[in-house]
Amino acid sequence: MPPDNELMNELKKELGLVQGVILLTTSLLGTGVFALPELAALAAGDISLWAWPLLIILIFPIAIVFAVLGRHFPHAGGVAHFVGMAFGPRLQRVISWLFLSVIPVSFPAALHIAVGFGQALFGWQSEQLLFGELGTLGLLWFMGSRGASSSANLQAIIAGLIIALIAAILWKGAIKPADITFPAANEITFSRLCTALAIMFWGFVGIEAFTHLSSEFKNPERDFPSALIIGLMLAGSIYWTCTAVVLHFGVYSDKIAATASLPLVIVHLFGIQALWVACIIGYLTCFASLNVYAQSFARLIWTQMQYQPDHYLAQLSPGRLPLHALNVILACCCVSSLVVYALKINLNALIVYANGIFIMLYLLCMLAGCRLLKGRCYALAVTGCLLCLLLLAMLGWKSLYAGCIMAVFTEAKTHGVRRIRWPDSASRDLSDQHLYL
């Protein structure tokens, strides 16, 4: 059995710093940049102007731990690999399944947001929206077959369009810093702040998926941490700016679709003809996020099948891409989208339940950091654990969904599941693996 490093070398190493920043930024903005500003404004009003900086502060220690782990242990398995190094192969496979379990809730939510722009442009309803979602899955397959570098090049264009659009809104709307009013401390309601944070966390879902691409950086030790931190700060700044715009123009209401606020502002400033531009950019940002996630899920499945090298899902395409795994992922997405359509499940519910799983994954990665890291990074990992617990508490009873999924997979891996032979390196002694940073 080839060692892990040889397995990872089968994937193309074609990403640099700029491409990494672009991939993460567009992934984080993706489905949220048009929807979350209005959802945050609805949940907390002006308080959301404080909520975004607070969320960035909460996420920052977590992001640094992800960056350090991805720098020193680059692997297409991402979080599951880190957890496996810290706690052994059984929990590694549990985490892999936990990450994959987010597909039934996160992908339909993201696809629904994406094709919502078709509704704004063409008045799509019901079956038309469903066909739009299925067509988007076809485009995801096409991009997945082109590799990470091609995705980064496309997403560089998307990132440029997003920044240009926001700059145009600020310029045409003549919005100045003095026009943005932060609420006083005594006006902040803790319950509304927690509600906003629980929804807004969706904007920073993507960090864990980004770690699956760490092994495809040309120089992961140098470029991966920088790409992660720069991308995080850039995405957070754009989210805050968009929320300030939505609040400034007052375009948030229960009667307005989640993705309609910024397009309404654009139509108000530039005329109805600009709606095309807004909707195309909105769709592309959602597509960018979906693209990163689809490729991340495929790489996770591929790494988990490496200990059955003859398996269909363990094979790479001639272009050294895990296309078989990608096919399975997109087929699952197709089925889950059909189920959500048939049952008419609410978008907000999908987002919050998905957030619970992602926060659980972040918590487990922080626990792995506590085991693998020493020094200042150990302290950050402990802080990250506490922050993840706080975020789970903010979700309230809805966080039980993630807990139940975790319990089911843990029980399944303990009883009744055929054991797979793992190499000795997967459960090696970690006494010499701690990093003093």
Language model segments and positions:
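A generic transmembrane alpha-helix motif of multi-pass inner-membrane proteins
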Residues: 367-437
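TM-loop-TM module centered on a large, flexible mid-protein loop between adjacent transmembrane helices
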Residues: 79-88, 120, 124, 229-291, ...
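Transmembrane helix-loop junctions in multi-pass membrane proteins
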Residues: 33-37, 114, 143-149, 273-274, ...
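Membrane-interface loop-to-helix entry segments
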Residues: 115, 127-176, 187-190, 228-233, ...
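Membrane-interface "cap" regions at the ends of multi-pass membrane proteins
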Residues: 1-38, 42-47, 59-60, 64, ...
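Helix-loop-helix junctions that connect adjacent transmembrane segments
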Residues: 7-11, 49, 54, 123-135, ...
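Hydrophobic transmembrane alpha-helices that form the core helical bundles
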Residues: 39-43, 61-137, 141-145, 159, ...
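Juxtamembrane helix-boundary/capping and inter-helix hinge elements in multi-pass membrane proteins
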Residues: 42-46, 74-76, 85-91, 215-223, ...
